[in-house]
Amino acid sequence: MLTVPEMGLQGLYISSSPERSPVPSPPGSPRTQESCGIAPLTPSQSPKPEARALQQASFSVVVAIDFGTTSSGYAFSFASDPEAIHMMRKWEGGDPGVAHQKTPTCLLLTPEGIFHSFGYTARDYYHDLDPEEARDWLYFEKFKMKIHSATDLTLKTQLEAVNGKKMLALEVFAHALRFFKEHALQELREQSECMLEKGAVRWVLTVPAIWKQPAKQFMREAAYLAGLVSREDAEKLLIALEPEAASVYCRKLRLHQLMDLSSRTAGRGRLGERRSIDSSFRHAREQLRRSRHSRTFLVEAGVGELWAEMQEGDRYMVADCGGGTVDLTVHQLEQPHGTLKELYKASGGPYGAVGVDLAFEQLLCRIFGEDFIAKFKRQRPAAWVDLTIAFEARKRTAGPHRAGALNISLPFSFIDFYRKQRGHNVETALRRSSVNLVKWSSQGMLRMSCEAMNELFQPTVSGIIQHIEMLLAKPEVQGVKLLFLVGGFAESAVLQHAVQEALGTRGLRVVVPHDVGLTILKGAVLFGQAPGVVRVRRSPLTYGVGVLNRFVPGHHPPEKLLVRDGRRWCTDVFERFVAAEQSVALGEEVRRSYCPARPGQRRVLINLYCCAAEDARFITDPGVRKCGALSLELEPEGCPENTGTSPSRREIRAAMQFGDTEIKVTAVDVSTNRSVRAAIDFLSN
């Protein structure tokens, strides 16, 4: 067993063999200066991961919140009747002719930063504000994507409202989650005969599968701030990955609840194809309208008909096409219990419906000038929101074979503001522009040809198809024959047609659930009832720590040599916990043991490193970065619980799990057999 040098340790120094030591690296190595000394107590061979039984928290009801980029909502089911999914009440407001049961992800705060409203209420109230007054209100929309794109996400990260004012992102998300919490609890109180006891609710939050650990932790922190759960009851909150939730839900569907694009288009010409898709969507809308009337959706107690046809080892892909991102995952069916195994780490990118909105904004910049659009958004924020709403309504009617042009209303304030800024009217601007597919109609509207509208879809749709094709080319996912298109953007006939045209000829069966926009929400409820359904996941990154190894000439680089007390060490060695793309079972643990470096030490901080490569040797290698810190809180010396063992020799056994939707850690003080408060912080960088 190794001893601890006098000098305190920095970073994480784990020893899995007698050839390793916790001696610190020399000055200049990329580590923090926090004193987090530990002595390794692991055996000579690195312990193999162990699986333990999952501890299920008791609950009476599951409430899932699908927090989307463009729209959000909640649903719930009782533990006594898990197959009955109760949808939220129909929201007040809404867009005429738009079949959508969720509410826009729009938050409105007063000029003082106090919560005013959310969803349709927020959007409509902001729309009705006087233009000058609206400049002082804080209106946030489509802000979920900011968390995904932030490279240095912390608890201090800020979001910018439409008027340019900034606010802590954590508070913005907490306002939104608190809104859903209060609505859901009120509805539960009205439906349940007995009052819900504290802790009776298991909450589920959906996030994209491609989100990294800091973004997932951020959502959990926002949930704590919103009061969904306390840190002491952290297990009452689950993070569900959106394509996984969709996959869980699709397992329950019957054939009449699915639209098979492959069979709809087989053997038909273009006209027959269009009629088939349009007809199927009318049927889907009617089915959805009827289900909304009752707001209770019953799923199969077992698996649906499509799943009943599948056999052990069958593979399928889920493409979650949402407002902000496309999320791809590939699952393999395991029998006899119908559990799922992830075959390749989640992939995707920023190819959501928002990309079409950005293309429309770029089109306006080409016509009216980038400087004017920027100024209009800044000085007339409410009118800009009106314009985006008008475009959204027309975007939903776009189709690959639509014959007629689409009219988009320009707010009067846009027309007036442009005339005052440029000295001529918008019709003149359109005539002078190089955009030939957009005209000015006699009704005072932008008249877009179908070609122009479809061009706005092209970059986003192409990005989605390219990602699917890249994933299908991976050796690990060979044999996939079924593709589920889910998410709000999957309602688009443009996207459906493009995916079927590109992939249908490869023998891939493309299937769309009728309630495609609610698939993730309903699946999140089912996931909350049985989170163990996804039994094996793939680690998206390689995780580990920095250690010192006995220096071996010819094997270790000379620049990594460190001599201390006459012993030669190799510094900055990357000790791997789990490798990128490694299969990790749910409940599987990676265990390490440590002891404090100093008597009386109350806290141990251990730096975690990650990279995309599987074969990184040193924490200084390109692509390896510090991504978080493991914190262990120790009992003070002299506590009755302490058996008298010297703190410097006290063993702390930590167990980390990489097979869940979040990386989790637990720790035990071996001398007392008491739990040690342990946490991993990914937001401190």
Curated annotation (Swiss-Prot):
The modification Phosphothreonine is found at T42. Expressed most strongly in heart with little or no expression in other tissues. In the aorta, preferentially expressed in lesions. Coiled coil: none annotated. GO terms for biological process: angiogenesis; endothelial cell migration. The modification Phosphoserine is found at S25, S29, S44, S46, S276. One of its GO terms (molecular function) is ATP binding. It comes from the Eukaryota. Residues 1-50 are annotated as: Disordered. The keyword Glycoprotein does not apply. Keywords: ATP-binding, Nucleotide-binding, Phosphoprotein. Belongs to the heat shock protein 70 family. PANTHER family: ALPHA KINASE/ELONGATION FACTOR 2 KINASE (PTHR14187), HEAT SHOCK 70 KDA PROTEIN 12B (PTHR14187:SF39). This is Heat shock 70 kDa protein 12B. It comes from Mus musculus. The gene is Hspa12b.
